[in-house]
Each structure stands twice: as C-alpha cells, then as structure tokens.
C-alpha cells in the first residue's frame, strides 16, 4: 500500500523529531533521514515534500552539513527551517552572513509579502528564534516573506518553485501559529491528502506481517508496558496462535503488576502466555550490587538467559517480536526498517537462536503507539500507563536491593498512585514514580523516635522523554500524599518531592 511521504532532512537540529511529529499530527506520514542522503536514494523514496531542519552549524563553517542543489530541482515543495533556510538561500545564489545581533527567544514577525505559507495568519506574528547567521540577500526568483526587529529577512519564498524558508522555528509551541503555517505547507502548497491514520497503519502492518510470517512461530518478550503489549496484539492479529508471549517476572515489578498482566493477556486477549517467576533467581544475582549500570547489566543478561530457556521449550521459533520505536531507529542512525528484518544477536540474544525480527512499531513515536492502543480497544489504564524502565524497581531502589526495600517502595508507589487516581490527577502526569534512597532519617512516630527511610516522589510532564518538566502539585495535594505515605507505609518517616527538570537531571534517579 503506497502512502504520501514527507521527508525531514536532519542537519543536527534539536527539533528534527519534533518537526516529524508535528507533520504526523496532520495525518501525513513523515520520516527523518540524514542530510547527506544521496539524491538517487531520495528520488527512490519519492517524497511528496521535503523539510530541511535547523542545525547548530554555520553554512560557511568548514565541514558544515551540506546538500545537493538538485533537491531544489526535483519539482516538489521544500520548506527550510532556520539552518535549512540559510542553506537553501546560499545554495540558490543568496547571501548569508554572520549576524552582529544573535537572536534567541521570542520575536515579533512582521509579514511583508503574504503568501500560501502565511495564509490565515495575522501580520504581526509571535515566533521563536534561535540563530546567529542571517540571510542578507534572497536568491534570484525569491521574495522576502517578513522581518523581525533584528532580522530583516526572517522568511523567504519562491512561489513558482514552491520553495519556502523561515528563520524561526514554526514547529515549537513558542510559535503559536506555527502549526497553522505547517498545515498550510502540507495542504496549500504540497497538496497532500491527510490519509495516514492509526487505523490505516494497523491494517497495513497486520497485512505485511501476515504475508511474511503466517504459518511460522514467533515469540515476544512481554513486560506489561504499552510498547510490548501493542506489538504483541498487532502480531497476534496477523498470525494468531503462532505467537507466544513470554512474561518474565524478575521480582522488580510494581505492586500486583504480574497478576494484572497475566489476567489481561490470558483472559481478555486470549494470547498464548508463558509466565516465568524468576524473582528469586534475579534477586540472588543482584545481592550486594550497588552500581546502577551493573544492576542493568545483570538484569539484562539474566533476562536473556531465562528468555532463551523458555523460547527453546516452544521449539521451531522463526521470529522475535520487539517493541522498537521510531525514536530507536532514528537514534541508531539507520534508515527506517521494514516491519520484518533478518537479525542476529538481538539485544544480546545468542547468535545460535538465529531469529528474524518483527518490529511492528518501528515507524511510530511513543504518542502514536498510544493512539494505536486506543484503536485496538485497550483500556485507558494500559494506554495511559506511565513509562516503566526495563530494570524495573532495581533502579528506583538506590544502592543495594533487598526484599524489604522493594516491599517498602512498592507500597509507597501504590499509595501515591491510588491517591492521585482518586483526585483525578494521575492521567494528567506523563510519568510518576517513587524512589527509595539508600539512607535512613530520624523522625518521631507517636511518642517514639523512628529511624526509617525517606520516600522521594518524582512526577514529570514530557512529550517524548528527551526533556521533561516537574509537575506542579498544589500544596494541599503534596500534604495529602505525604500524610498517606508516612502513615500507611511501614518503614517510612519522611516524604520528599523532586522539583528538578530534565536537563539538568534525568527523569530516573539511576
């Protein structure tokens, strides 16, 4: 099934993924490729439009990202953003210079020549700038779109060739009319049809898996998280009972999580599920280990051993299902993968397993996986479940892991989640969890001195986990959470709220 494609050429800008996501929000399929993709490869992909991203370089800097001028002669619309606009201007005969006044932050754009990109947008437009170089003279055939106080040419366009450039970042929320301008580019200029939906994605993906994998066996390592759950359901729709999910309980799950996952898959989805309680095995391996990277390594290696043992019991397995996302594909620097590909030593799995991969989510961002989950009829509890790391509570118990610490943390986590669900805030938060530090503090309970653990609450909002901001609870809510945790969780006498954003902190503590 062919679909319209918009390509974002990545020049190293921090917003390249955001551009792709904004395009997809308009039901237009979009992929990111490196700026140095060959012109032949680009033509093979047959995009309906191209977006040139921003980037940290100067167009005159030695070794700065460049592109083939033939891109502008293919005959399809091109939109250059920030560095992308400067490069377009330079390659087509304009002049770019280092600006004496760098422009960072909000600016007011005065539109001098209205055009298809600015249609329906008011003349004085708030935009977000982040640049040093500026276009001093537009290329032949181009017009100036508008200016800001410090940038005389803040946008340019050639209506005959459908080439447009903006010095500002229309993809960020700080440019309020940016989405409208992007919509104008996609539909007024590129004449796209907005036919890419999660429903069509499901249909297309299931058919592709059916064609290549029907009648052959596949296994899926299930975590209970949304990625592996949605991946498993898509594959089950394609190959039915030939899929077996393996759910390894490493003893580091949240309260009652193993029961919830088993009930969901065995009763509601009727998927073949192998449940392995390997909690003692994992905890024995982790005894005395305090370094977070060592914890991750031990858990990863042990998971592989358990998974391999169970997969061999099934016998004659051809495929391994993974919940790889498009962000993983982009980060690895590879081109977009097909749903099914040949692969050895997957995630450290021994080469002799000789499995091919099925990755039904490798074209999707995290928020799109949630949309697919809704299309598949998954409950809100699963769809909006907060992200949970592979090593589980091992990296939320700081220092050495013991059964006592895990029990305390599980209970605290359950109490916080319960309270926030009661008052209707749980689903407003992107990620929420508690942390148990490797210290005890003095307190008073009743008339007696206590010496117990503190609990740290971490709650953040984010779009993709790359950056995050701490959630602003009211003082009343924090007081309720503190009272419940300290009174209901044995071994805790202090409650702390982490108000650090990412960056400088990471979301997880380890």
Curated annotation (Swiss-Prot):
Its EC number is 6.3.5.2. Catalyzes the synthesis of GMP from XMP. The lineage of its organism: Bacteria, Bacillati, Bacillota, Clostridia, Natranaerobiales. One of its GO terms (molecular function) is ATP binding. It holds the Pfam family GATase. ATP binds at residues 223-229. This is GMP synthase [glutamine-hydrolyzing]. Residues 196-385 form the GMPS ATP-PPase domain. The active site is at 82 (nucleophile), 169, 171. CDD domains: GATase1_GMP_Synthase, GMP_synthase_C. Residues 5-195 form the Glutamine amidotransferase type-1 domain. It comes from Natranaerobius thermophilus (strain ATCC BAA-1301 / DSM 18059 / JW/NM-WN-LF). It catalyses: XMP + L-glutamine + ATP + H2O = GMP + L-glutamate + AMP + diphosphate + 2 H(+). InterPro entries: Class_I_gatase-like, GATASE, GMP_synth_C, GMP_synth_GATase, GMP_synthase, GMPS_ATP_PPase_dom, NAD/GMP_synthase, Rossmann-like_a/b/a_fold. Keywords: ATP-binding, Glutamine amidotransferase, GMP biosynthesis, Ligase, Nucleotide-binding, Purine biosynthesis. Homodimer. Pathway: Purine metabolism; GMP biosynthesis; GMP from XMP (L-Gln route): step 1/1. GO terms for cellular component: cytosol.
């Amino acid at each position: 099934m062919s679909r319209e494609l918009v390509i974002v050429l990545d020049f190293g800008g921090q917003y390249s993924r955001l551009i792709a996501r904004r395009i997809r929000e308009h039901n237009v399929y979009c992929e990111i490729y490196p700026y140095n993709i060959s012109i032949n490869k680009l033509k093979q992909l047959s995009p309906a439009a191209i977006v040139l991203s921003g980037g940290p370089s100067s167009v005159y800097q030695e070794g700065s990202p460049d592109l083939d001028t033939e891109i502008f002669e293919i005959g399809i619309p091109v939109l250059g953003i920030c560095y992308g606009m400067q490069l377009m201007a330079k390659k087509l005969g304009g002049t770019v210079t280092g600006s004496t006044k760098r422009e960072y932050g909000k600016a007011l754009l005065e539109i001098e020549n209205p055009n298809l990109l600015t249609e329906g947008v008011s003349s004085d437009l708030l935009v977000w700038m982040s640049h040093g170089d500026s276009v001093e003279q537009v290329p032949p055939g181009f017009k100036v779109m508008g200016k800001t106080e410090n940038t005389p040419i803040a946008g340019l366009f050639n209506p005959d060739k459908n080439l447009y450039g903006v010095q500002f970042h229309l993809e960020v929320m700080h440019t309020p009319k940016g989405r409208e301008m992007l919509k104008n580019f996609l539909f007024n200029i590129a004449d796209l049809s907005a036919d890419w939906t999660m429903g069509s994605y499901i249909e297309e993906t299931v058919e592709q898996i059916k064609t290549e994998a029907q009648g052959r066996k596949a296994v899926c390592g299930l975590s209970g998280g949304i990625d592996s759950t949605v991946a498993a359901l898509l594959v089950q729709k394609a190959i039915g009972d030939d899929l077996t999910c393996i759910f390894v309980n490493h003893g580091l799950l949240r309260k009652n999580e193993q029961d919830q996952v088993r009930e969901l898959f065995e009763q509601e989805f009727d998927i073949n599920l192998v449940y392995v309680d390997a909690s003692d095995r994992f905890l024995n391996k982790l005894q005395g280990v305090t370094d977070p990277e060592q914890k991750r390594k031990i858990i990863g290696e042990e998971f592989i051993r358990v998974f391999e043992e169970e997969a061999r019991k099934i016998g004659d397995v051809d495929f391994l299902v993974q919940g790889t996302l498009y962000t993983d594909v982009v980060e690895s620097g590879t081109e977009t993968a097909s749903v099914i590909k040949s692969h050895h030593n997957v995630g450290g799995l021994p080469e002799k397993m000789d499995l091919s991969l099925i990755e039904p989510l490798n074209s999707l961002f995290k928020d799109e996986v949630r949309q697919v989950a809704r299309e598949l009829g998954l409950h809100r509890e699963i769809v909006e479940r907060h992200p949970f790391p592979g090593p589980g509570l091992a990296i939320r118990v700081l220092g050495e892991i013991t059964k006592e610490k895990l029990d305390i943390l599980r209970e605290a986590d359950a109490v916080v989640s319960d309270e926030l669900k009661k008052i209707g805030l749980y689903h407003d938060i992107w990620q929420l969890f508690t942390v148990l530090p490797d210290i005890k503090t003095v307190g008073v309970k009743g008339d007696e001195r206590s010496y117990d653990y503190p609990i740290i609450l971490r709650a953040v909002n984010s779009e993709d986990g790359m950056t995050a901001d701490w959630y602003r609870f009211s003082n009343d809510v924090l007081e309720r959470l503190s009272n419940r945790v300290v009174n209901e969780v044995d071994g805790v006498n202090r409650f702390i709220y982490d108000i650090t954003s990412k960056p400088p902190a990471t979301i997880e503590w380890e």
